Amino acid sequence: IGITGSKGKTTTTTIITHILKELGYHVFTGGNIGIPLFNQIENMKKEDIVVLELSSFQLMEMPVSPDIAVITNISPDHLDVHGSYEEYIHAKKYIFKNQRINNKLVLNHDDEIVKNFSKEAKSQVSFFGNQEIKDGFYLKEDKIYYNEEKVIDTNNLMLKGKHNYLNICA
């Protein structure tokens, strides 16, 4: 699982890791989050899950895409390195560039640029956001829903703030 975006990468990576561990999966977390995975490769098994926080710089060097890719949002960032906002957006697309039809791409429906990535995806696409979404998680009236079914009341969450609730939806 790879997570990228201008904001929310670390939080979303941490949330996904926590949820998977709570469900009983053996999870390795790394990438831009500061945990080197190279030393852990020998300990990994085929059934283990790797959750990676991926920066635009890392994405440009990747010859493969993760089976599940998440894009939290995009706003002008690192323009000193990328040269332009368009180049930065292009770099973020590398997370799904090499996905296959049986892979999954999770996009922020509230971010027009990110939402439009669905037009270029070869993989299955689902969305998350602030409005009702078919086949996706969304935030409505302090509750998180999936396909119109309430999953949790945000008052029951330790993390606070609308931005964190959207990270949970991702």
Region spans (language model):
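Phosphate-binding loop of NTP-binding sites
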Residues: 1-109, 113-124
